[in-house]
Structure formats: C-alpha cells, structure tokens
Amino acid sequence: MEQSIKLIFERRSIRKFQDKKIEEEKIELMLKAAMAAPTAMNYQPWEFVVINDETKISQIRSSLTFAKSLAPLVICVCGNVGGVSRLVKDRFWVQDCSAATENMLLAATGLGLGTVWCGVYPITMYVKRISEILQLPTGVIPLNAIFVGYPAEEKEARTQYKAEKVHFNSY
C-alpha cells in the first residue's frame, strides 16, 4: 500500500501519552505540514499557539469537556479573521484551519507521535475560555486544541469505510 494512504489509516486518536518531551524539530515539521494545507483564495488564516507550559495545559484540559489527556504538548489551531472579507470570515476559515489540522495530525503520526483533536469552536464558552488562557487578540478564534505526545497506547490501523455512505451522481 502506498505510504501516504497507509499513514492515513494509521492515524488514530491517542489519549494516553508517555511522559516524554517532544523534540523541537518534530514540532516544527508538524507546523510546516500544517501550513502546507490548501486554503480558499490562498488566504492562510491560521495561527498556531504551541503550549508546553504545564499550568496552561492543565487549564486547557479543565476547560474542555473531552480534553482529559495528559499530553506534554498542546497546539491550538486558530483562525485569524480580523480585517478579512465576510465571505472568508463566515465560511472558509474553519475549512482552511481544519485542513491544516489534518495535515498536522498526519505529520505527527509519521513522526511517531500520537494526537487527539479536541474541538473548541463553535462552542461559545470553550472559545471564550481558551481565548482567555492563551491571551488571543480580537479576531483570532481558537478552532481546536490538539494534544500531542509519544503514545502510551497502541491502536491498530483502520478505515471506517462504509459503502452505503458513498453515492454516485446523486444521493
């Protein structure tokens, strides 16, 4: 199987991590992969907040209902919608930042890291709390918090393909 397809199937949500620091080079590669994602009108609305401060990670964990992983690193993917057209602001930043997030998750998997994507936007109380913790400026909206670390659990590669979910030419 082609390596890129294999990597997609190997990417799984990991919620248990080793107590091991992630190398700066791997963090940078993940961010480079994220920023290689396609965007509407090449707008590139993303901002990435890399968090390795244990206090801030703990605050993020306690602010998000499903974010209980004890990871040594969190990357918050945000959309910078300040001063952009309504079309981009209202519609495309979420898609653009989601594409960047998936690239980052795949890169992490290829680097031997585990990740779990915890949604922030559009839950108002999550957006408000994460914005406060990270001191985000007006116009920068947190989309998600990606917990990253060396996996302390193994999950088999899989696809969730269901033929009945595929429709050709019409529903």
Regions found by a protein language model. Give the residues of each.
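Acidic, surface-exposed loops and disordered segments
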Residues: 1-171
